[in-house]
């Protein structure tokens, strides 16, 4: 152990199997959150016979037992001296975190102390020192300015960072005077534009000294504020009697908030103004046109092919703004619109094209390839004809998107034309858990009285694994619909429902289930130690079966400890498999494995037996965020 003095870094995620993360004293400021004011000094409890202690990474350790020694203030100069300067300069991490910590607490004396010790800002710290401060006081901000000979932060960064913090112009005024005194040339136009862009709660007092005391281009600032919708700045500059031409101003891609502001000030949007707005292709063309339509400023005579082309080029769905209130049929190419509407699955635009003369049957081959089943069903109900050529049928669209009862018209047509069978469709869509009404319909088309669906096993396991989602009503509905659960599926459901006696009876009567790995996996996943004991005994503690049980239990410490303590399987031999399995969604399991020496950073190969088994179920063990 490198040091006998440690501090709590993270408390256990699982109190039943505690793993304490602790850090040694030279890494306290490197690893602790800058908001923390106090830290607990601890030591491993060496009196415990089963004490475990391991190093995770540089300066971070883990143990299962600790004794608390004292609470240590991180705002006490003596503690800071001990934590920082008994060790190397690099050990306490980016120095801006130290300054931000003390500046946020207005502990300027501690900043003095750091400067006396020549603790300079590390590289790229200019913005970070400001970003990590929490509600800094005026005194803290002035401290940075007055000590910038030491900090060496660019003055541009100081302006851009400090102005949003201030609630009066005093600091800004002080900075401007300072720049004049040291003869430092600064681009105040850029400063103001940056502040306007990046400040959500900008007060006019923040920038008033720049406007009043520097030679910035007020008209440029005015236009920029108009484009950003900063109404309080616009109003302030108007009070300064800034000169502008309204027609020129609206060419500058102003926001809808700004436009509404000027309308409320008494400006009338005549045909010239509207023509300028809609033909200047502003970046917010959708919002601008919607505003003009909603406020009844946009009239039929102002709508041009150029405007519609711009709207459509931005997004075909934007055309929906016009189709209900204006006559635009002669201004667009309907054949182009229908193709784009199909591509974007826009039923509203498809309907509009049909109502204006498009023969939808000409496009059904494209629609079958591009559109979701709900749209195809809707078109069938409107009289569209599905072509007889099976090559247009894409079963993957059914598999991925046919989840709701509004797909039934399309399914009915597919089955009638013998493009697919109801039974095959059921097998293909079941893993995506379709609406029960779809299954009820499909089952009426199945020739046999009852069918079994092997893929349903994976659905049950996967839903429970990812979401702890077991909905008995859904499975009861499946049974009522005529789906027959096979013996494997019945057993898995009984395990989930904790019907231990029933499970044992079924397995006794069906020997092939005793070594079934999916049943073992669900048993461990559901914390069924009684069933696990039964399975291990009936398999006579077969080593291959034990190894699978060990690997599956990597996400369940209770089961894992039971297997380790009650069998002779060696976890060290299966580090890779256990680490991959645990890495999926239980980080406290990883902590447990690491503490006990069962962890490795290397995943199993993607073609390993474990990966193949989990892939068959549909569980991605290589993606912890899935």
Swiss-Prot record:
The keyword NAD does not apply. It comes from the Viruses. InterPro entries: Ankyrin_rpt, Ankyrin_rpt-contain_sf. Keywords: ANK repeat, Repeat. ANK repeats lie at residues 217-246, 333-362, 421-451, 515-545, 547-571. The keyword Repeat applies. This is Putative ankyrin repeat protein L768. It comes from Acanthamoeba polyphaga mimivirus (APMV).
């Amino acid at each position: 152990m490198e040091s006998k003095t440690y501090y709590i870094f993270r408390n256990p995620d699982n109190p039943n199997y505690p793993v304490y993360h602790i850090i040694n004293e030279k890494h306290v400021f490197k690893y602790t959150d800058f908001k923390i004011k106090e830290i607990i000094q601890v030591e491993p409890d060496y009196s415990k016979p089963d004490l475990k202690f391991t190093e995770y990474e540089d300066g971070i350790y883990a143990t299962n037992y600790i004794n608390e020694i004292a609470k240590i203030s991180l705002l006490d100069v003596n503690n800071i001296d001990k934590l920082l300067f008994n060790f190397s300069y690099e050990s306490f991490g980016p120095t801006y975190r130290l300054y931000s910590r003390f500046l946020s607490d207005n502990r300027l004396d501690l900043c003095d102390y750091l400067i006396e010790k020549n603790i300079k800002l590390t590289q790229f710290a200019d913005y970070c020192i400001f970003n990590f401060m929490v509600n800094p006081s005026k005194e803290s901000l002035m401290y940075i300015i007055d000590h910038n000979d030491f900090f060496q932060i660019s003055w541009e960064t100081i302006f851009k960072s400090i102005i949003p913090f201030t609630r009066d112009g005093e600091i800004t005024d002080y900075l401007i005077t300072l720049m004049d005194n040291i003869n430092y040339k600064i681009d105040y136009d850029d400063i103001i534009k940056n502040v306007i862009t990046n400040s959500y709660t900008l007060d006019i007092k923040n920038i008033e000294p720049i406007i009043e005391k520097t030679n910035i281009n007020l008209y440029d600032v005015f236009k920029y504020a108009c484009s950003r919708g900063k109404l309080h700045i616009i109003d302030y500059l108007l009070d300064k009697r800034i000169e502008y031409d309204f027609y020129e101003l609206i060419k500058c891609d102003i926001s809808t908030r700004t436009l509404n502001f000027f309308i409320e000030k008494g400006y009338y949007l005549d045909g010239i103004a509207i023509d300028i707005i809609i033909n200047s292709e502003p970046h917010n063309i959708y919002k601008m046109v919607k505003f003009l339509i909603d406020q009844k400023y946009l009239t039929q005579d102002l709508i041009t092919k150029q405007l519609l082309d711009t709207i459509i080029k931005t997004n075909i769905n934007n055309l929906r703004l016009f189709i209900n209130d204006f006559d635009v049929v002669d201004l667009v190419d309907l054949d182009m619109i229908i193709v784009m509407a199909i591509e974007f699955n826009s039923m509203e635009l498809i309907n509009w094209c049909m109502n204006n003369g498009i023969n939808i049957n000409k496009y059904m081959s494209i629609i079958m390839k591009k559109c979701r089943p709900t749209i195809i069903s809707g078109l069938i109900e409107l009289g569209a004809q599905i072509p007889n050529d099976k090559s247009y049928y894409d079963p993957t669209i059914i598999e991925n998107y046919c989840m709701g009862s509004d797909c039934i018209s399309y399914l009915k047509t597919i089955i009638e034309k013998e493009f697919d069978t109801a039974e095959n469709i059921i097998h293909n869509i079941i893993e995506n858990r379709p609406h029960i009404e779809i299954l009820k319909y499909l089952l009426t088309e199945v020739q046999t009285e009852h069918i079994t669906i092997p893929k349903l096993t994976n659905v049950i396991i996967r839903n429970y694994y990812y979401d702890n989602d077991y909905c008995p009503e859904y499975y009861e509905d499946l049974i009522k619909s005529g789906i027959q659960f096979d013996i494997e599926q019945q057993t898995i459901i009984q395990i989930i429902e904790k019907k231990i006696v029933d499970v044992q009876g079924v397995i006794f009567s069906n020997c092939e289930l005793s070594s079934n790995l999916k049943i073992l996996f669900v048993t461990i996943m559901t914390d069924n130690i009684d069933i696990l004991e039964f399975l291990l005994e009936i398999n006579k503690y077969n080593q291959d079966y034990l190894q699978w049980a060990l690997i599956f239990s990597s996400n369940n410490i209770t089961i894992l400890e039971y297997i380790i303590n009650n069998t002779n399987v060696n976890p060290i031999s299966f580090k890779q498999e256990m680490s991959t399995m645990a890495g999926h969604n239980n980080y406290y399991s990883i902590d447990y494995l690491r503490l006990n020496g069962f962890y490795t950073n290397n995943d199993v190969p993607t073609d390993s037996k474990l990966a193949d088994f989990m892939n068959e179920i549909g569980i991605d063990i290589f993606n912890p965020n899935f």
